[in-house]
Amino acid sequence: GVYQFRSAADQVLYVGSAVDLKRRVRSYFTAAEKRRQVAQMLDTTVSVRHIATPTLIEARVRELRMIAELDPPVNRRSRAPRRRPWLHLAQGSGSRADPRLALTTVLPTEEVGHAVGPFASRGRGQEALRAAESVLRLGRWDGRELRRVRHDDVPAEPAEVLACLSGEVDLVTAPLLERIAALSRAERYEEAGTWTARLRCLLRAVDRAERVRPLLACPHLMAARRREVGGWELVAVRWGVLAGSMTTAPGADPRPAVELLRTSARVVDRPGRVGEVASIEETSLLADWVLDEGARIVEVDGDPAVLTWPIGAAARHRKVLASQE
């Protein structure tokens, strides 16, 4: 479930989630807890409230939602998730009629298949944009030397840009890796490091987008995981939103629970933009639960092909993704 530390003014100071609420809350009051910020919080705490949930994944999602809604002062993460930028192909306007790569915090749902992100900050988004722009050449290049990555040095066609943003990231990755190798051979290590960092920003955003796209494209998806004590955990996801969850008893037939969850789960209309109904953090959390090893897809409404990954997925470049900033 979810727990809240509250002040005398009934302000929520901190929100957390745990499998065993009693044990987790008790741990804050032991000698093992050394964090100064926690000690300060406990000095002003007058009560602890909890909300029980049928599954841990629902508790984690509720925790994210409460942090976004209540903005507790002691929680350091999950702040302002809806203001994180995406990289997409923007249509030109005014004096700039040609399409261009741009960052946006308002991404229409129908564009999620052709955008990458979200980025943790606008600065990282700009670094990823520079990496892509140096190859795709849709705008004026502001770099120096090694300007010609494309053999013809002409702007990419919009279709090629969309392909890069929707699963063929090697259109950018391959030329940039060649550039980084050339800089290293020339012993220009600082420049090679700069381009590696830019490529890493891009690949991490692509990897993040590839994880959440399947759930954002599904009007209804139900998945199941075996419980250690027996039985199943069932989760319903609609348009990237947790619509409901439940468990089944050990040895019980799970099919009635599947039917019950399908009919009792929250009704979710397709949102007009990404993040309108659920934060990307929520969708990412659900993607980790639904799509990783150990989960079984029970049912999917719509085209099941949305659950596939492109052959050229960003996860292929594990060395770049795993490298440090």
Put a short name on every predicted segment.
Residues 1-13, 17-325:
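Conserved catalytic/ligand-binding micro-motifs in nucleotide and anionic cofactor chemistry
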